[in-house]
Amino acid sequence: MVKRVSHEATNCPVARSLDAIGDWWALLIVRDAFRGKRRFGEFQKSTGAAKNILATKLRSLVDFGIMEMVPASDGSTYQDYILTEKGLDLFPVVTALWQWGEKYFFEAGESHPLLRDRLNRKPIRKLEVLAADGRRLRHTDTTLMPQG
């Protein structure tokens, strides 16, 4: 097995972010948390992850401040895992992956859950990167600049 290298010392925001959410289990757990799952068993059933892998990934998400453990909402002795503000800020990331996956990995008419606006049940707009003035940007319209 290849040992992962930490990117915490790099100056790249993408690389640092991948330290926290760069494996598929992490994003599947976050996806499920957005869908209302809170318990270890719910995450395990939905993702199919082995208990040891799921425990490690949940601990990592807690350590990175993406999720937190709280007493169970039903008063039982269980713990719930809930998204923090940092975790909730991943909603556009998960939505972009959802839309990308729908576009490239499903055949026309192939059945899968549809992401819809809860209020009116209509499709949500495709996520776009916008300039400060509202223009739609492509990757060729952006550049990297030093801070300061």
Question: PLM features: residue spans?
Answer:
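N-terminal helix-turn-helix DNA-binding core of bacterial DNA-binding proteins
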Residues: 12-53
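Canonical helix-turn-helix DNA-binding module
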Residues: 44-72, 76
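A detector for short, charged/polar N-terminal pre-domain segments
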Residues: 1-9
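Alpha-helical linker/hinge and terminal dimerization helices associated
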Residues: 17, 27, 64, 94-104
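Short histidine
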Residues: 7-8, 25-30, 40, 69, ...
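Basic, amphipathic "hinge/linker" alpha-helix immediately C-terminal to the N-terminal HTH DNA-binding motif
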Residues: 22, 73-94
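C-terminal regulatory/oligomerization modules of transcriptional regulators
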Residues: 95-148
